[in-house]
Amino acid sequence: MTTETLTQLEQHELFIRRHIGPDSAQQQEMLNFVGAESLEDLTQQIVPESIRLNRDLAVGSACGEAEGMAYIREIADKNKVFKSYIGMGYYGTEVPSVIQRNVLENPGWYTAYTPYQPEIAQGRLEAILNFQQVSMDLTGLDLASASLLDEATAAAEAMALAKRVSKAKKANIFFVADDVFPQTLDVVKTRAECFGFEIVVGPASEAVNYELFGALFQYTNRFGEITDFTELFTELKAKKAVVSVAADIMSLVMLKSPGSMGADVVFGSAQRFGVPMGLGGPHAAFFVTRDAHKRSLPGRIIGVSQDTRGNRALRMAMQTREQHIRREKANSNICTAQVLLANMASFYAVYHGPQGLKIIAERIHRLTDILASGLTAKGVELVNGTWFDTLSLKATDSEAITARAVAAGINLRIDSDGVLGVSLAETTLREDIAELFDVILGEGHGLDVAALDAEIIKAGSSSIPAQLVRTDAILTHPTFNSYHSETEMMRYIKRLENKDLALNHSMISLGSCTMKLNAATEMMPISWPEFGNMHPFCPLDQSEGYTDLIEELSTWLVDITGYDAMCMQANSGASGEYAGLLAIRNYHISRGDAHRNVCLIPQSAHGTNPASAQMAGMKIVVTACDKAGNVDMEDLKAKAAEVAENLSCIMITYPSTHGVYEETVSEICEVIHQHGGQVYLDGANMNAQVGLTTPGSIGADVSHLNLHKTFAIPHGGGGPGMGPIGVKAHLAPFVAGHVVVKHGRESDNNGAVSAAPYGSASILPITWMYIKLLGHQGLRQSTQVALLNANYVMKKLSEHYPVLYTGRNERVAHECIIDLRPLKESSGVTEMDIAKRLNDYGFHAPTMSFPVAGTLMIEPTESESKVELDRFIEAMISIRGEASRVESGEWPADNNPLHNAPHTLADIMDPEFDSRPYSREVAVFPTAAVKLNKFWPTVNRIDDVFGDRNLFCACVPMSEYE
């Protein structure tokens, strides 16, 4: 019989062992190799003593998975899921089970990274290309992005694009129609203030009265009205204004496209295509423009190119527009977007096809017609005379109606002046219409849904003006007309998944990306209706579960970061940067220091840093780094003194982007504070801080957290993400607010940075579960093992590749950089060759050429076992051996396994392969481990230059697949 106690047998800390890859024996073996006695000893060797956290985090102790699920079930049950007719950009939708099970709940889709390595990402690239095709077909425009964060931020991007491309160069006014969604206007105003644009709000028809660089209209508008903008757009374009339209994706199935009216930009939320409301997100926004503006399009674009065999292949196009290359000159700061949700929406369109979508849209519209017919027959006056799915009612007894609605478990939209709104959705049934009659009219109305339907059919009239009915065909590509049975759809999704390498196959060691385990238990609650079916603008007493979860999570994150308050609104890390910089900006303005607009940024910073600073209206001054990769203190002091009068802040990353804990970090903060500035600490590398130190104790004033890195939200192939910001008390009054939802906080009336008050709220349960399950013990140990894994990999590889930077005691933090420049000089083998060759070994490449060109940055995370680390190390050593054969002249520089990587099945089946100076086995089975678990790239190396010179960003003809 065991002598263990009951507490030990209950295994409350079991999840820690599930999350952390190396077991205790493996950890000790690795510690012995790197020269440390224990994790604590290693921590003391690496983390500067002056910043170490000498207490347990106040997040509670670890708990078991079943226990954690019980806790979050109690929280979820506090949410009251009413039938929502609020609309305003958020609607009930049916998530097809085949998509929920095979995409949303499938680690093959949700654990992949942004497709920077396209040869091993052809599946999700095709799904995103489908999303772009849906966007282009429905909007009637030429070129779509791969997704933006939400509809409101897409509106702000449309405004920025309009300013870039408008030929009305002297104009500084952006017009916004007064019937757009209020949250959209709120976000646009926030962005415009930083850019110095003047926002004019008024009736759409008045736009022609101003000298504009751009204008924004809603189609259909917030009250449900459908407007033909053709003449207005013609007038505006004659005045050189760029016209943008916020459009409802479901209505576009039936309505004339904005592009055919003359719109230059069309955007909106794809939420209605099979993505739950989730208290506001995550949802993909579509963004489409004309070909003439392609260089100004924000975000990723998926394009068609060819590989070295001349076969069709997909990849991210025109990356020179983006923040990781153009930095402060980029079109936007977008990095993480909403790819997983865009993929769900694209699969929704594929599954239903054009006819299925038309039936869904027509059913929604018919139910709206029936509701309107019944209400008007009983004397109810409608504000709008046309509609797709939304009615606005002039109600003389709105309080009584609202009371009946609440009693029936129904939420209506309450506008000013006694106007009530009703927006129907895919989830609305005929029984719901009968219930709405009871709520709005009271009992005894005598209306019958079937009879009203028959009358509408007999009358043959329409609430959609004839000239606004869509007449052109949509989604004609075979992809949208082939997979309508569940069997075919399941297999199509699986075929695409098989082309992609995600965490369910092997380690993804991307530096500064933290590709850790996204545990199944953490993921499960996001599929629950108690979290998924909540409207972001529902009454607060209905979302008590969400409120409790967010407040507790905020309390935990405050303690983890050492800050005083959290703002949970930003939808990505880059969005969090922008939100944090806005807090700094508004803090200075409140003190009469509006002139403080200079942001110091080290040359090693992430590309989003200068891009975000530019968006916040700041001027960037770059500071140098020394030979060790640290911030050059003398240069920093000189530049801080030089711009002292106008210094707003500095943006630093900790540990640094060079993968070390800089000893001078607190001194950096002191220098900035001495000159009246604030310190923004980028949270991208927070996985090396949790439980060991805090940004607040270091001396920072504000940080964003990448919940999709440090706190286990999956990357989803390029999103979703969350970037909440932590702030010191003096900045708390200046964080983002929201125009619709008020919480009685000092920041309520501040401008918003996202459409919803809590951003992508429905993925916050993942982070809540992560912290709850690990507890203070697991969080600290996770960070320590992340350090151990990185130092183990670094020391193993240092015998074969030079390590670019180390910190105190020749250690690195949670990531290391290997320098490939000497190898390139001696052999001609490039970092690109090594990255593509790793695909043949079954690995995604580490981060290439950041922060230093010609390097690889490796971040293994705590979730990878010693077995997996050794497999990666073996691959890297084997590749170095292959490079040696090129160095020696045994293999030609232009015909060797690295230069020709990656290799496909077609390669080894090709009889001409025999002419190569290496064998088929060397090409595709270079180690014994690869033979046991082979991943096959489906295309050869892709020609990016060809793709950008021959830009094509739509679904290709089916003949290309043959």
Curated annotation (Swiss-Prot):
Stored Gene3D superfamilies: Aspartate Aminotransferase, domain 1, Type I PLP-dependent aspartate aminotransferase-like (Major domain)
Transmembrane segments: none
Keywords noted in UniProt: Oxidoreductase, Pyridoxal phosphate
Cofactor (UniProt): pyridoxal 5'-phosphate
Group of enzyme by EC: oxidoreductase
GO cellular component term of the entry, any: glycine cleavage complex
InterPro entries reported for this sequence: GcvP, GDC-P_C, GDC-P_N, GDC_P, PyrdxlP-dep_Trfase, PyrdxlP-dep_Trfase_major, PyrdxlP-dep_Trfase_small
GO molecular function: glycine binding; glycine dehydrogenase (decarboxylating) activity; pyridoxal phosphate binding
Pfam families noted in UniProt: GcvP2_C, GDC-P
Taxonomic superkingdom: Bacteria
Modification sites for N6-(pyridoxal phosphate)lysine: K709
Disulfide bonds: none
EC number: 1.4.4.2
Signal peptide: none
Reaction catalysed by this enzyme: N(6)-[(R)-lipoyl]-L-lysyl-[glycine-cleavage complex H protein] + glycine + H(+) = N(6)-[(R)-S(8)-aminomethyldihydrolipoyl]-L-lysyl-[glycine-cleavage complex H protein] + CO2
Any GO BP annotation: glycine decarboxylation via glycine cleavage system
Function (record text): The glycine cleavage system catalyzes the degradation of glycine. The P protein binds the alpha-amino group of glycine through its pyridoxal phosphate cofactor; CO(2) is released and the remaining methylamine moiety is then transferred to the lipoamide cofactor of the H protein.
Assembly mode: The glycine cleavage system is composed of four proteins: P, T, L and H.
Family designation: Belongs to the GcvP family.
Name assigned to this protein: Glycine dehydrogenase (decarboxylating)
